[in-house]
Every structure is written in structure tokens, then in C-alpha cells.
Amino acid sequence: MPRSNYLFTSESVSEGHPDKVCDRISDTVVDAYLAAMPEARLGVETLATTNRIVIAGEVRGPDSVTFKDLEALTREAVKDIGYEQSGFHWKNNDVAIHLHAQSADIAQGVDAAGNKDEGAGDQGIMFGYAADETPELMPAPIFYAHKILKDLADARKARQGDAAKLGPDAKSQVTVRYENGRPVEVTQIVLSTQHLDESLDSADVRAIVEPYILKALPQGWVNEGTVWHVNPTGKFVIGGPDGDAGLTGRKIIVDTYGGAAPHGGGAFSGKDPTKVDRSAAYAARYLAKNVVAAGLASRATIQLAYAIGVSKPLSIYVDLHGTGTVDEAKLEAVLMDAMDLSPRGIRTALSLNKPIYARTSAYGHFGRAPEADGGFSWERTDLAGKLKSALA
């Protein structure tokens, strides 16, 4: 019997968090190659530390994308995030790029040839999840943890009042109380943010961020019993990769469902959409969201499994957490028929061979609005009617 009354906590980190800086750079490289050649293959890792950025990995793409281009794009990404401090400045950082050709052994298993369809780029398991806790069909704790930081970043970049005193590096954490299985209030708020004005103390920072936090959360969720922890260690001036080294792919729970659903372990950023770590996780979210949007369940978890060089998923698993109106085994069969879940099928259905990934690198890959150019296409609910009809 699932619990109905409990507390659940999720965290998010801002675009200026060291690991997110690296995710942004890796996905900027992915976008550069996909813009030049939609079938490009990439596995790109980034390390960022004091005054230094290192980009390494494997690429199969056009020579028209030069290292000089990538260095300029990297500096522009860091500038957009907002780093102009002595230990990490977009203009002065040393940028080293070490990209080489994709392994021929991997390519022969992944490439389509003759009657062989394009295979998965690796083995692995991927999960998708949806819940009717927010209009975006996301778990409430992670959705609002993201929203707090996104709103603060937007205000900082727009230099709105005292928000201009904040720095790019920040973390949030939201504890939500559930009653009868529904989110009803926030019991704890944690917000740590870099500040450029060294004279600010915790109370000063709270005065800046509190209005944005209150606006980001549903009305009535914050009350006199809510406990606030704003910059609980005091001063937070040295931030970003100058304070802690960053790496691509270290915030996989922040990127997904904040711990409310299982995770297969594969990161997203730096990978082209032939990599099922990314594309199949997007497909699983797309299916789960459409199941909930169709009214077939209040919560849905979907697992997909792949083997390198094999085009079709090895298995699909559906868990509706006791909230479903349909048989889960029957739904599994319907989902397999509703969408081609081969790597090529996913990329085609969701139009993934586009430069749409840098924007995913912060504030979550899920729960975002589908965009006109194909960004966040996996958040569409255009499959809901088909699923509902198939199970009527």
C-alpha cells in the first residue's frame, strides 16, 4: 500500500553551478555539430576549474566545425551564464579542446547497413515518469526547486533591483508535505546563492530572494510554519568552477525527477540523440506524460532497456503505482505499437537531430514547454488521444 501522508524533498542547481557550466558547454558543442550535420555523433565531456576549461571526447562530424569555433562558443556560453570573476572569466579562461574521431568499433554496431537498422549506441536502462502534481505533469518538489532558481537567474540577468547583486552559482531544495497523496505545502526551503556584494549577510540575501521564492510557489504553500535556510553558512562570494571543479553529467537526478522516480544512471549532456541514454529517456518521459495526460493514471513510470547495436528495445515495463484505470501489461503492448522505439524511430518521432540541447542543460530536461523549433518535443501530449482510444 503506497504511503499517502509524507514529506518529500528534491534539489536543483542553477546554470552557474560548476557541473551545470560543464553540461552547458558539452551541449553547446553538441548543438554546433548538429547544426552543421544533423547525423553527427558526439560524446563530449567538459571539466571546469579555476581559470580553465577542458573539453574532451569523441566526434564524428564535419570539418567545418573548428576548434576555434568551439572555443568561441564556449566563451559565449560562460558569458551568458554570467561569469566575469577573477578566478573564472569568460574572456580570460584557458580553453583546451581534445576531441577525436568516434571509435570504428562502436560505429559498426550503431550504423545502419543493408537490411540492418541503426542500433542503439550502448546498452542500458532508461526511465520516464509523470505525475499529475503540476500542470506540467511533474513531481512538485523538483518542479518548484527548478522554478525558484530559474526565476532568480532571469531576475539576475535582467538586473532587476537587488537581484543584480546575486552571482550565477546557486542551489535550491524544497521539502513538500503530501496529504492523501497530494502536495499541499512546503515545510522547508533551502536556498544558497552566490552574491557579488561581499557585505551581504544571510538576512540580506533572504530579503532579496524571498519575493521570488514566494512568487514561484503555489499560493498558500508557504506559511508561518515553513522553515527557511538561506545561505546558512553565511558568506558565499567565491562561486562556480573557481570554488569547486565541475564535470559534465554529475547532476542526473536534478536533470530528471528529483529522486521521485528511478534513474538508469546515464547522463544526458554531451551526447547526440543516437545515444539512448538521452533519446530513450526522452521517449520514456514522452510516453509516461501521455499516459497521465490521457487520464489512464495519476502516476506512471516507464522503463526501457537496450543493447548496443540492437535497434529495438529489449523490454518495456510500466508501473502505474496503483493509480491506473487500465491493465499495465496491456498498456505495455499498446505503447510498443504506438511509437517506434528504435533509436532512429525516437529521433524521427521527436525530431531530435536538431541543435536543441544547450537549453536543456539547466533547470531540468522535463516539465518544460515544447518550443516552436522542436525544443522539448518530448513534452508534447499529442499521443494521449491515440493511447486513450487504443485502450477504450
From Swiss-Prot:
Residues holding L-methionine: E58, Q102, D244, K275
Gene3D superfamilies for this protein: 3.30.300.10
EC class: transferase
Pfam annotation, one family: S-AdoMet_synt_N
InterPro entries for this protein: ADOMET_SYNTHASE_CS, S-AdoMet_synt_C, S-AdoMet_synt_central, S-AdoMet_synt_N, S-AdoMet_synthetase, S-AdoMet_synthetase_sfam
Family: Belongs to the AdoMet synthase family.
Subunit structure as annotated in this protein's UniProt entry: Homotetramer; dimer of dimers.
Protein name, UniProt field: S-adenosylmethionine synthase
Source organism per UniProt: Methylobacterium radiotolerans (strain ATCC 27329 / DSM 1819 / JCM 2831 / NBRC 15690 / NCIMB 10815 / 0-1)
UniProt gene name: metK
